[in-house]
Amino acid sequence: MKFFIDTADVKEIREANELGLVDGVTTNPSLIAKSGRRFEEVIKEITGIVDGPISAEVISLEHDGMIAEATELAKIHPNIVIKLPMTPEGLKATKTLYKRGIKTNVTLIFTPMQALLAAKAGATYVSPFVGRLDDISQNGMAIIQEIRTIFDNYGMDAEIIVASIRNPIHVLDSALIGADICTIPYSVMLQLAKHPLTDAGIKKFLEDWEKVPK
């Protein structure tokens, strides 16, 4: 399984990359806004840190505007993946960019059928949002299983990026289901490495070491 980091915070990206945990990065307008920096400036800096797919989202909601934005974003670096909304116009743009050889990540997916449509349009990645489904008392992980089954049934090439991850259990369930990628907030990445028995074991080893004659 590949891990993407879901942030536009360059400091977090550097730290996670140093841990060897970052195969790619996903950003969105909300994350960029939190950084307080210019969009292109942030994206360029990220491409200099991580050698992997960097998802950058368009703002336009209609096909021609999406294509114009995508064309400019794709010029920044070969690793740029264009993030498009799961709408009819987004699907049209996905198809256009597929024909031009530009990679896409269709986002804000909440049903298996939306994922299927995105894959048929030529999306490189599909991003179902599990946490937001959980928030409205639906089972977010259930759609990951359904998407995995559909894609396997038909040999679809689109990779599943599990998004809106809130806790380590989301990552565990994604791995068990066979999702291709989890895009994870840095805080959750750090939680993956923690367990109280690990800390207790280290403490015990150090206490025992102090008893060894020096």
Swiss-Prot record:
MF term (GO), any: transaldolase activity
Q: Mind telling me which GO cellular component terms the entry cites?
A: cytoplasm
Question: Would you identify the family this protein belongs to, as annotated?
Answer: Belongs to the transaldolase family. Type 3B subfamily.
Catalytic function, reaction form: D-sedoheptulose 7-phosphate + D-glyceraldehyde 3-phosphate = D-erythrose 4-phosphate + beta-D-fructose 6-phosphate
EC numbers for this chain: 2.2.1.2
Pathway where this protein functions: Carbohydrate degradation; pentose phosphate pathway; D-glyceraldehyde 3-phosphate and beta-D-fructose 6-phosphate from D-ribose 5-phosphate and D-xylulose 5-phosphate (non-oxidative stage): step 2/3
Matches recorded under NCBIfam families: fsa_talC_mipB
Where does the record place the catalytic residues?
A: K83 (schiff-base intermediate with substrate)
Q: Which CDD domains does this one have? A: Transaldolase_FSA (cd00956)
The name under which this protein is listed is Probable transaldolase
Per the UniProt record, the source organism is Geobacter sp. (strain M21)
UniProt keyword list: Cytoplasm, Pentose shunt, Schiff base, Transferase
Enzyme class of the recorded protein, top EC level:
transferase
Kindly list the places in or outside the cell where this protein is found, as annotated in its UniProt entry. Cytoplasm
